[in-house]
Structure formats: C-alpha cells, structure tokens
Amino acid sequence: MKKYFEKKFWKYIYRRSLNNWYKRNFSSPSPEFVKHEIIKKNNLDNSLWIETGTYYGDTTNLLSNISSKVISIEADKRLYDLALKKFKNSKNIQIINNKSQNTLDEILKNNHNHKNLCIYLDAHLCMDHLTKE
C-alpha cells in the first residue's frame, strides 16, 4: 500500500513539474528529474564527472552512483559545508569550495587517470542564496 501511494505522489510531482515547465515554454531550469535522466542516458563508462554547483547534492549523489569519481565545485561556503557532511562517507566524491572558473583548469590538469571525463555545468544563481559564479 505504501509503494502505491509513493508512486502516486511521484507521478503527481513529475506531472506538476512538467506542467510548470511547459507553461514557461520549456525555458530553464528544467525539472530536476529531466536533468537526471539526461545525465544517466549520456553517462560514459569509468567516467570522472566534474560538477559545477553542488547546491544540496542531489545531482552529486546521482553522479556518484553511475561514475567512478565525482568532483563537485561549490562556491557558497554554507552549501559546501552541508555537502561535506552529506558525503563524508562517500569514497568517490570530492567537494571543493571555490568558484569553478578559479579551479577547473587545475582539476583538469590533475585528473588524467580516467577513461572518460564529463563536465556538468550547473553553477547558476539559485533562488534562496546568492553566489556569483
């Protein structure tokens, strides 16, 4: 019975998100589950993912489940600290507190041991905090 209601709940959330996105003429940002499906569909084997903008770590968590390593860059100190706590037991996640334009070159130079490299540019101005990325 619980699974039935969970499924109904998520269908409602997805439908509502898609309707809102449609009303905005499919302008950015797309619903989170749409982004996640695109990421899963385009993932490469044995990949290193670099994510700019950790925020609350939902995409970071997804990436850690489908890749060999995730490096997530978060400029906001509060969100960085939250991510460190959230992922303290994750062996394949590295969180960096910096702006992506200040650290991306260094990350690319120091990570050549992965077969594939994928970059998810997700740093942007969020509604509830201000970080100029």
Indicate where each model-derived feature is located.
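A short alpha-helical cap/connector motif
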Residues: M1-I119, H124-E133
